[in-house]
Structures are given as structure tokens and as C-alpha cells.
Curated annotation (Swiss-Prot):
It is found in: Vacuole membrane. It is a multi-pass membrane protein. It holds the Pfam family ZT_dimer. Involved in sequestration of excess metal in the cytoplasm into vacuoles to maintain metal homeostasis. Keywords: Ion transport, Membrane, Transmembrane, Transmembrane helix, Transport, Vacuole. The chain crosses the membrane at residues 124-144, 150-170, 192-212, 232-252. Residues 1-123, 171-191, 253-376 are cytoplasmic. It comes from the Eukaryota. Belongs to the cation diffusion facilitator (CDF) transporter (TC 2.A.4) family. SLC30A subfamily. The gene is MTP6. Residues 145-149, 213-231 are vacuolar. Residues 1-28 are annotated as: Disordered. One of its GO terms (cellular component) is vacuolar membrane. This is Metal tolerance protein 6.
Length: 376
């Protein structure tokens, strides 16, 4: 039960809590699991159904002011609450893997619901692009007439809105029209590349605005003077821009798009770093690797060991490599079927693009795929 020990030990932080979880989890003598299959019928499977948090730690307390400042003053109860919160999230992830094992798929929206959401999002994107083009033209006129750096900066902001829409459209179009012979694994890497290009353009324009603003502070000339009529036009245009933006916010607030959430919640610097990490092959979190290990171990009773579980970014999704150990006398046909099924399960997870399941009969050999070509 090498994999069982690895998964159960990962649920604790080196405290006694994790050691107490292991015996109950491995015995599998509990009731029926969440997928509708009784754990007693398959005692070789890991089973965490009987584990529940104490009532005193059901909810994590709200974050206090000192937590937002960086946790300079730490309360003794915060660590305990955070620990149980992580345990709860880990158990929820295991339950999700049990559902995938028992049903063969994860519950989600129907095809009709997905099409309805796609149509609504497409309409919102079209309206946003049309509004941005109108606003950009109006801001260009206001910038030429006024010469105000504030209005020019707002004009560049509208230009960036149009550019971001074009980049998103181009990346989506490229992913759908990729040639399977020239690009065997598709063009999913176009998304992080497009975001990096957009971030570079935005940083360049922002830096140029800062330089021009600094230069104008030391310029004593009085070049740009507006008449009353020109001021009225400029103010009306900027008020119209603000009104249209507010209407778009109200209309689009119901769409919980992850890309838009990243743009609004995280800073652009964090977004750039995130996409850089996705291109260089950063490993998945330990909690996610535990979920994958749990899924592979509970796949089939013939699995003797799980030698390796890797998940690393290759674009916006994960590539997964799993090495499982089967009996050395197992027929090839049976071993192939056992190895193919977890690959299909792994690739059905929304975060995973490709999964590779390797079969072996022992786990004492040297690590495979030695880096013999590395020169550093």
C-alpha cells in the first residue's frame, strides 16, 4: 500500500492528525461511497467517507484586519482553522475523484446549457467590441482637440481594450483551426503567448504616458487652450464614455469568465508571471498531485505501486505523467486495458490536456528519461 501511505500522509502537516487518518482510510469498511458503490465491496480502495471535521472547526473564521496586512499578528486559532479548511478541501477533491471513478465522468452542464452560455458570452463580446470602437473614435477626436494627457491615456486604454479583444479572438481562432499534422498537440499555448504580448504592449504604452507626463511637468508653455465650446465637447465625450462603460459592467457582471476574473482580481504583473510559469512547465500543487494519486490508486486492484505522478503546465493546462506498477506475470492485453482507462479518466479532468500512463513491473530501477542532453 505504498500509494495509500503517500496520499494519507499528505493530508496532515506532520502532526498526529494525519497519522490517525491512515488506518480508517485504508480499511475501507465504511458505508457506501458518494458514487453509489459500497466501499466494503472493494476493500482495496482508499476510503475517506468516514472522516469528518469536528463541529468546532466547520467554518474558517473571517479574515481580520491584521490578516489583510500580512498576518503580522497571528492568532493561535488561525492555524487550526486553516488546517481543517485544507483537510476539508482535500476530502472534497477525493470525493470528486470517487465520482469520476464510479461514474466515468464528472457532472457538469448539459450541451444545451453550454451552448446558451456560449451565445450569451458571444453577444457580450460583440457589444463590448462595438462599444469600444465607438468610444475609441470619440476619444481620438477629443485627444486631438484638447491635447490633454489624461484624455490621451484614456484613448490608449480604449485601444488596449480593442487589442485585447483581437488577441483573444485570434488565439481562439488559432486553437480551433490548428493543423494536426503541423501541430500534433494543438495550439493551446497561443493563449499565454497572447497575454504576454498584450502585457508587453500595455507596459510600453503606460511607460510612454509616464514619460510624457513627466516631461510636461517641466514644460511651461501654454500651448493647449480650449474654448468654451471645445470644453463642452470634451466633457460630453468623456461622460458618454463613462456611461457606456457602466452599462457594459452591469450587463457583463453575470458572466463568471475565468480570464476576466484574472484581469479584474489579480494585478497584471501577477498575470504575466502566471503565464510565464505556465510556459516553462511549473509543477502542479501538492494537493492536486494527491488527487491524481488517489484517482490512480483506486482505479484497479491490480495496481501494486504508483511509482511516479507528475503534473506540469504546458500552456494553460497540465500534462500528466503517471507510472504504475502491475504484476510481472500479467498478460499484455489486460495490462494495456488497465493502463488505458486511467489515462481517459485523467484527460476528462478540465485542468488536464494530455495524460501519459506508463506501465512497469517493478519500481526499484533508476529514474527514467535521464537528462543526458543537459549541458548546465
Amino acid at each position: 500500500m505504498a500509494a495509500a501511505a503517500g496520499v494519507a500522509a499528505g493530508t496532515g502537516r506532520g502532526s498526529g492528525e494525519g497519522e490517525e487518518l491512515l488506518p480508517n482510510a485504508v480499511e475501507g469498511d465504511g458505508g457506501c461511497g458518494g458514487g453509489g458503490t459500497c466501499a466494503g465491496d472493494r476493500p482495496w480502495r482508499l476510503n475517506f467517507d468516514g472522516l469528518r471535521r469536528p463541529e468546532a472547526h466547520q467554518e474558517k473564521p473571517p479574515r481580520r484586519f491584521h490578516d489583510r496586512l500580512g498576518g503580522l499578528v497571528q492568532s493561535p486559532g488561525d492555524d487550526v482553522a486553516e488546517y481543517y479548511q485544507q483537510q476539508s478541501e482535500l476530502l472534497e477533491g477525493f470525493n470528486e475523484m470517487d465520482t469520476l471513478t464510479d461514474r466515468g465522468f464528472l457532472p457538469g452542464m448539459s450541451k444545451e446549457e453550454c451552448e446558451k452560455v456560449a451565445r450569451s458570452e458571444a453577444l457580450a463580446i460583440r457589444l463590448s467590441n462595438i462599444a469600444n470602437m465607438v468610444l475609441f473614435a470619440a476619444k481620438v477626436y477629443a485627444s486631438i482637440r484638447s491635447g490633454s494627457l489624461a484624455i490621451i491615456a484614456s484613448t490608449l486604454d480604449s485601444l488596449l481594450d480593442l487589442l485585447s479583444g483581437f488577441i483573444l479572438w485570434f488565439t481562439a481562432f488559432s486553437k480551433k483551426t490548428s493543423n494536426p499534422y503541423r501541430y500534433p498537440i494543438g495550439k493551446r499555448r497561443m493563449q499565454p503567448l497572447g497575454i504576454l504580448v498584450f502585457a508587453s504592449v500595455m507596459a510600453t504604452l503606460g511607460l510612454q504616458i509616464i514619460l510624457e507626463s513627466t516631461r510636461s511637468l517641466f514644460y511651461d508653455g501654454d500651448t493647449f487652450r480650449l474654448t468654451k465650446e471645445q470644453e463642452k465637447w470634451v466633457v460630453d465625450i468623456m461622460l458618454s464614455v463613462t456611461s457606456v462603460k457602466l452599462l457594459l459592467v452591469v450587463y457583463c457582471r453575470s458572466f463568471t469568465n475565468e480570464i476576466l476574473a484574472i484581469y479584474t482580481i489579480r494585478t497584471w504583473s501577477m498575470t504575466v508571471l502566471e503565464n510565464v510559469h505556465s510556459l516553462v512547465g511549473q509543477s502542479a500543487s501538492p494537493e492536486y498531485l494527491q488527487k491524481l494519486t488517489y484517482l490512480c490508486w483506486n482505479h484497479h486492484k491490480a495496481v501494486r505501486h504508483i511509482d511516479t505522478v507528475r503534473a506540469y503546465t504546458f500552456g494553460s493546462h497540465y500534462f500528466v505523467e503517471v507510472d504504475i506498477v502491475l504484476p510481472c506475470d500479467m498478460p499484455l492485453q489486460e495490462a494495456h486495458d488497465i493502463g488505458e482507462a486511467p489515462q481517459e479518466k485523467l484527460e476528462s479532468l478540465p485542468e488536464i490536456e494530455r495524460a501519459f500512463v506508463h506501465l512497469d513491473y517493478e519500481f526499484t530501477h533508476q529514474p527514467e528519461h535521464a537528462r543526458s542532453h543537459d549541458t548546465l
